[in-house]
Amino acid sequence: MAIFVTGDTHGSKKLGFFSVDGFMPRLNTESFPEQKSMSKDDFVVILGDFGGIWNNTETKEEAYALDWLDSKPFTTLFVPGNHENYDRLTGIDDADVLNNWMYSKLPDEEKKKLREGFPQKFWHGGMVREIRPSVLMLERGYIFNIDGCDCFAFGGARSHDISGGIFHPEKFKTSKQANAAYKQFEHHASFRINHLSWWQQEMPNHKEMQLGKGNLKKAHNMVDFIFSHDCPASDKTLLIGPNKPDELIVYFEEIKQNTIYKNWFFGHYHDNKRLSGGKDILLYEQIVQIN
């Protein structure tokens, strides 16, 4: 049995000719020949911005890509990043949102899926969302026993590509009103659209953060590996220089200072680097075996 780890995939396909994104080109047999000797008891962990769940409903293209991934000889695990459709992954808490014009034409079955998210189940010591039988999202704050290794998982990150702000189409009564207001946004340098290209659940809530601390305490603050999308505050400073830390990377820094671990793997910064004397590892397109 083996555990491999890789960085952001941003969906199933390449985003451009020179792109290293897309889980299909990255995890095909040509790019990842190790899979030829793997089984479903072997694992590939994607460190956030999986991007395989993006539209409001499952399209034929998305279904094909997820079925393709499920057909691979290994099990795919991912922590969520900041570019994920959390409405579909974990469900919409506010029922009134589903009465909005954005969702009014959806069949009742699709609305039910949006209310509940993907099926949740207990797996290897923690809670996961089952996207496909062998494609699982690791919920925040749990310690999973994977191939005999204790792995703390905590996805999420604050988006840094929203300098133009967040447009909220759900605040308008009709699509016509929303489209008229949208025209004021479309010339901004960089912005996202709530429920369509940005979701506030990209950042964890207090309950999830407390759950993570509690589970680490139960494990005497000792794990083998940590999987996240963003990184501890000190690592971010090493990567980009002085910055204003948000509550998540401060939380991670506290975990870093108080937890004994072998390696911390994260994505988000689109590079491949070793930090903190090699203990903390940023990954993008590289795929590395960790056990």
PLM ranges: what are they?
Residues 1, 39-41, 73, 148, ...:
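A general structural motif
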Residues 1-4, 135, 143-153, 225, ...:
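Beta-strand-turn-beta hairpins that frame and shape the catalytic cleft
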